[in-house]
């Protein structure tokens, strides 16, 4: 068993002996708790477990068949309290373009894209953006895979590729539902991006995500998917790339020697900022 904390995997050896003897039983029990098929061990399965109703914590569970007949189980912790996080609490400020983001979010139409690797907090940012504009008189629809959090006052739709109801099909239906705002969980194919661009150009505010390393790459990706450059420039209002940066422990971090100004500039600091910054590194302690 391993836990991923702040992007780093840690072994939990105290469970090793128990899981070695009872792994299949634990896997079956988890399937029962999340209403998965306990007899299916050939195909991947997904499920959800309400973990702590009072605190609003749920578990998203994925079962993956592996060689030898066993299954790999991954559980993701979802905290509904994260929905109430304000944009300022996500580390966004005027220096990081918060004013530009708010301007794009409050526009009557256009496309706002959030990019970054898996697990970089794109969904949390999108939900925070929706919370910012979720007011009476605004019709908001979302197409997600899966629907991770229930949002009050927002129409959320679970896409089902297995029955032919993908993001593209959901978007076509949305355009007949008279929405002001549309959220697409992810732009994956040409069909989806074509409808999303059409929506952004016809009086709708569209939010979505892309898996690219930086903001400029998102424009290239849209063009590679078949959208003419003149439509991209007309439809896209803003692209924001984000990462989750680990914080140093305030109890054990110390100034890290040997970091040059050139290295800090390569990380995105200006020359003036790099000259004033004193990089620190945590050593690890009981507090962290």
Residue spans of the language-model regions?
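Switch/coupling sub-region of P-loop NTPases
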Residues: 102-112, 123-246
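Cys/His-rich Zn2+-binding cysteine-cluster or related metal-binding knuckle/ribbon modules and their
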Residues: 212-288
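Structured core elements
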Residues: 2-4, 48-50, 58-62, 74-76, ...
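Conserved nucleotide-binding/hydrolysis micro-motifs of P-loop NTPases
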Residues: 7-9, 19-20, 55-56, 64-68, ...
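Non-catalytic alpha-helical coupling and interface elements of nucleotide-dependent molecular machines
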Residues: 8-10, 31-38, 54, 64, ...
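N-terminal "pre-motor" subdomain/linker immediately upstream of P-loop NTPase catalytic cores
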Residues: 1-120, 125
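Short glycine/proline- and charge-enriched loop/turn segments
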Residues: 7-8, 155-157, 266
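Conserved phosphate/pyrophosphate-binding and hydrolysis machinery centered on Walker-type P-loop NTPases
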Residues: 16-23, 91-94, 120-123, 189-190, ...
